[in-house]
Amino acid sequence: MAKMAKTFVVTLKRSTIKCTQDQKDAVRVLGLKKIRQTVEVKDSAAARGNIMKVQHLIDVEVKG
C-alpha cells in the first residue's frame, strides 16, 4: 500500500490588518481569506515556510 502524503489543516484565527505585506501574502498563498476559514495544504517546503511566517495568526494540525 502506498504511503499517504502528509497534509496540514490550517485555520486562520487572527486578522492580518496590522501585519506586514509579506505576512499577508503568506496567508493568501496558503489559501486563507477569512477568519475561521480552514483549508488543507499539502506538505512541501514552500508550505512549511509560509506556515512559519504566520504561525502567530494560524492554527495548524497535521493530517495523514
Swiss-Prot record:
Gene3D superfamilies: Ribosomal protein L30, ferredoxin-like fold domain
Subunit architecture: Part of the 50S ribosomal subunit.
GO cellular component: cytosolic large ribosomal subunit
Keywords, sorted A to Z: Ribonucleoprotein, Ribosomal protein
Designated name of the protein: Large ribosomal subunit protein uL30
Listed GO biological process terms: translation
Domain of life of the native organism: Bacteria
Lineage: Bacteria, Pseudomonadati, Bdellovibrionota, Bdellovibrionia, Bdellovibrionales
PANTHER family: LARGE RIBOSOMAL SUBUNIT PROTEIN UL30M (PTHR15892:SF2), MITOCHONDRIAL RIBOSOMAL PROTEIN L30 (PTHR15892)
Record family assignment: Belongs to the universal ribosomal protein uL30 family.
MF term (GO), any: structural constituent of ribosome
